Amino acid sequence: EDWAIIIGGWDTLFFGNPLLQDRTFSMDVKGLFETVIKDSEIVHPEPYTQWEYYNQQCSLAEAFDKVINQTDDHSDLGKPNMYLCKAEEKGAANALASVKAKQNKDITIVVQPFGRSARVDNGDIVDDSSRSIEPHVYYKLVKKLSQKYNIIFMGEGEFAKEVEEEDSYSEKPQIPDIRAWAAIIEASDYFIGCDSMGQ
């Protein structure tokens, strides 16, 4: 079959995937309309609008499968894979070793408290879509978890800056690359997040 994936962002997540890498195109590729889009039937999957997904009755991968392949039988889906390179894996191992040396615990948890729609508004973190953990809840969570676990805060710089006064428990690395974050999440023991980026 001749098919392609056109993605508005995060196309680097597909790098290294033997099935998807050569079929994935960023929206800003010159000539994309003429070479790929013009003669194609377009399927615009939006898994977040699937009842089963937002009621936690199917995974994100199953929601995509339902929309793209028009099926409720997901038995043929394998485990999702991210193909990381050695440098990404080594970078994650080094980051975790640094966190473990500072926080001195055996188990590491990455916490992503704020979703994509969160923003800073006059010193407060707000999320109009209500998909983020409220800051006061996040502070209680990391305070409690930090008694037994190493904590890594996953979030953009403006959020790290806003939480640093109340959250002295977590490491707050500023990593703009989502593949590096994927490697850190994969190398960690647990992940707590409210946004599909981390999931």
PLM segments and residue spans:
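Short, charged/polar "capping" segments at the starts of alpha-helices
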Residues: A4, W10-F15, R119-V120, G157-E164
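A short, surface-exposed helix-loop junction/capping segment
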Residues: E1, E41-P45, F114, A118-D124
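Short, flexible/disordered intra-domain loops and linkers
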Residues: Y48-Q56, A118-I133
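Donor-binding and catalytic core of enzymes assembling or modifying cell-surface/extracellular glycoconjugates
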Residues: D124-Q199
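Active-site and donor-binding regions of nucleotide-sugar-utilizing enzymes
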Residues: E1-A61, A180-A183, Y190-G193, G198-Q199
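A general structural motif
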Residues: D2, N104-D106, K148
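A nucleotide-sugar donor-handling region in carbohydrate enzymes
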Residues: Y48-G115
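Short beta-strand segments
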Residues: I5-I7, Q112-P113, I152-G155
